[in-house]
Amino acid sequence: MDESGRQRPASHVAADISPQGAHRRSFKAWLASYIHSLSRRASGRPSGPSPRDGAVSGARPGSRRRSSFRERLRAGLSRWRVSRSSRRRSSPEAPGPAAKLRRPPLRRSETAMTSPPSPPSHILSLARIHKLCIPVFAVNPALRYTTLEIPGARSFGGSGGYGEVQLIREHKLAVKTIREKEWFAVELVATLLVGECALRGGRTHDIRGFITPLGFSLQQRQIVFPAYDMDLGKYIGQLASLRATTPSVATALHHCFTDLARAVVFLNTRCGISHLDIKCANVLVMLRSDAVSLRPAVLADFSLVTLNSNSTISRGQFCLQEPDLESPRGFGMPAALTTANFHTLVGHGYNQPPELSVKYLNNERAEFNNRPLKHDVGLAVDLYALGQTLLELLVSVYVAPSLGVPVTRVPGYQYFNNQLSPDFAVALLAYRCVLHPALFVNSAETNTHGLAYDVPEGIRRHLRNPKIRRAFTEQCINYQRTHKAVLSSVSLPPELRPLLVLVSRLCHANPAARHSLS
């Protein structure tokens, strides 16, 4: 009769005994029992002498000398050890089905990414509300992987202050690896937040201006994104070399940057998140079939993302369910995402609005240090930076070729130790007072909140230090001598007017005019 498939019921008596078939008995229990038996012997109760006791005590056969308590204890301990070892040798088989592990295995199951992942339907979901004001978000467990084992050649995609990017062109994937563990936690949370906002914005407002993650690895400190053709900086160089300035290119550019402006307003206002690092390298583009016109672009690189005053999740927490763990792993909102940092806001100064440069020169930083970022400040910074990226394209592709002179958007890349210097801030403000009036549109649609461009008198009036005011005045005079005559001869095709109007509104000297885009 075959009984290989049978099992004992849980109530069987064998479930209460050891796998060796005998009742488990600890040494402590045995010692207590043995001492109790010795006390009974000492009380005068008859007990026959043991040959083993005599052998251990060293007494001669037939001797009536009574062994000491220590000798009897040693003999009993020896018998207990012998009996225990004999039971182990007689039952070498493994524990049966009744024996179960009381803890999870030490080695967790591996989840390697072996094929290109599909875009997620969601990234975060509200799990519960803790203490009435702390939302706890569950991270989509399908995004997590341990190792990246997708076949295909890797190529260098770029590097920055926090990590580098590798491209897998065969599968249209980009893998970003963060160097530092602390910065990986910050960027991962920021990427998950912006990614969820991007998915919700696409469903409810048809806003698709942000890159969404496809997966992440805590062990490798990696985040996987869809790969794009190139960034905006490379596209500007390619467009300038091809000299492909057809009306269709200008129309596609206008649609692209209008959508990006809507996305920036949505992120800052509805989501309470400010990007704070919009530049050509962080705008990723896809080309149409003609290889020159743009498809809708996206913003990437959320290393400097900060929650602004419109955010309701600054105290939020996150939980991630991992394999073989009963309870999910929890982690809170990184402090770097919840407070403003003046150094982060100013950066190198290339794309920052004039009001920030003036505050930098006046040393007015108290309102930004260790305080929540104001929504209107974050929105004004992001919109101005987006306008500067568009202005970079217009100057490099249209203005400089039409003049035959290498005119640039900024006076030069002058900074020390990756920080903005006062000399460069003064030069940048003065240079914009000459460049912007030559390119910005001066009309009713751009002058609702005053002139769209900065004038020297307005900047000079806000500078407190007399020495800095004199330096600014001298720089304005110098740039007017070297650039004003050249820029006065700029002649751009009429199809660029919508782009120039958009630049004038995005880079308006009055922050309130930028807010009106929302």
UniProtKB/Swiss-Prot annotation:
Binding residues annotated for ATP, in chain numbering: G157, G158, S159, G160, G161, Y162, G163, E164, V165, K176
Residues covered by region (Disordered): 1-22, 39-120
Domain Protein kinase: 151-518
InterPro entries in the cross-refs: Kinase-like_dom_sf (IPR011009), Prot_kinase_dom (IPR000719), Ser/Thr_kinase_AS (IPR008271)
Record localization: Virion tegument; Host nucleus
EC annotation from Swiss-Prot or TrEMBL: 2.7.11.1
Residue positions of the active site: D277
GO cellular component terms, A-Z: host cell nucleus; viral tegument
Keywords: ATP-binding, Host nucleus, Host-virus interaction, Kinase, Nucleotide-binding, Serine/threonine-protein kinase, Transferase, Virion, Virion tegument
Reaction it catalyzes: L-seryl-[protein] + ATP = O-phospho-L-seryl-[protein] + ADP + H(+); L-threonyl-[protein] + ATP = O-phospho-L-threonyl-[protein] + ADP + H(+)
Start-end of Low complexity biased regions: 44-61
SMART domains: S_TKc
Gene Ontology terms, MF aspect: ATP binding; protein serine kinase activity; protein serine/threonine kinase activity
Superkingdom field: Viruses
Family statement: Belongs to the protein kinase superfamily. Ser/Thr protein kinase family.
Additional notes on this entry: Displays a substrate specificity similar to host CDC2.
Name of protein: Serine/threonine-protein kinase UL13
Organism: Human herpesvirus 2 (strain HG52) (HHV-2)
